[in-house]
Amino acid sequence: MSEAIINSEQAAQLWPLPDVDLTNLDLFSRGFPHQVFTDLRRHRGALFHPRTALTPDGEGFWVFTRYHDIAAIAKDNDTFSSAGGGDRQGGGTMIEDLPREMGPGSVINMMDDPRHKALRRLIAPAITNARVAAMEDVLFAAAGSAVQAALQQERVDFVSAIAAELPLFAIASLVGIPHDDRHQIFAWINAVLDYSDRQLGETSISSQQGMQNFMAYGHKFVEEKRQNPGSDIVSLAVTGELAKGLGKLTPLEQLMVFSVVMVAGLETTRNAIAGGILAFIHHPDQWLRLQQDGGLMNSALDEILRWTSPTPYNRRTATRDVVIGDRLIRRGEKVTLWWASANRDDTYYEQPFAFDIGRQKNLHMAFGVGGHSCLGAQLARLEMRVILLHLLDQVDGFRLDGDVNWVRSNKHTGIRSMLVRFVKRY
């Protein structure tokens, strides 16, 4: 006898953790709540998060927590859209619907093929592996300067002194942001992404002002690239033509290239670097292991990315009715893919809660999966590597000097500040 098919209303009644609301940002105020998702992974297949007082848009959403389920959905871009679906006016990759002017259908991570694929091809020459490799010397020097300055202090906020400083330098150099503008842009982005004073779907005065200032700067910057283009990623977006007769990018799409490159380039790498050092603080044996065997660097980078999962989830929207297992996901319903949960799934990983820099089987999802995987992955890895190389050469360990101050967000697993004392080698 076949199983009965269950729709979202019925599945909402079966939500296994009635006291847990994944849209309550307090749940994420001390980092990603791994125990909650360990409990959710015990339940096979699709779960439906019921509507609560906090869920945006007055509706619930599907939740996928297991590695293999998430991989399959992330690769099915025809059924699960990054832009939107059904009769929605907005969409995007966050739980809350974003209006069209905020990105869905216009920003690369909220686009669908064929335009998404054509945009990736257009801007990819600005961030090829060869081009990233050519940045190694200058990034190594910049990392060295940041580390040396930090080591002169008795204690330091590792996030602002090192973890944020190199990504800011790297992405600004890649795009061509003037040196004097960099820290102001960083402050605007922080204001937009920090949910310390609001809930999902809400805005605050600081976030509104940050967004307005950031986008106004972006408009001006894009126009300057239109007048004086180079070979950088924004210039390619402004001057280039999409393949297959899709024409030029619209002005909004051009602006969104600037926006997503700056935000993703700063936020994701900063969080991975800071979270990686926190992992080494909690697992000092792994720092010693990496000091003794530099050949573990690549696997260490992958383990840091798996462990930190800087972007915990992405959302898709169903473009048609589809049955997965015994669940009916209907056209227009929200579907969330929790990368951070997949990265601790014991049906894929052996001992997923062990921080093991020599881990061999580690096809982590920190950069996403499928056609929407992160274009800047190699740059992020390079930034992480040059910082670690300097620290490994001069530091035998780290000690926390106070509590870790986490960003209150379910979309970014980030550390706002982290006071650290270095155990210097000499």
Task: Provide a role label for each language-model segment.
Residues 1-426:
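Cytochrome P450
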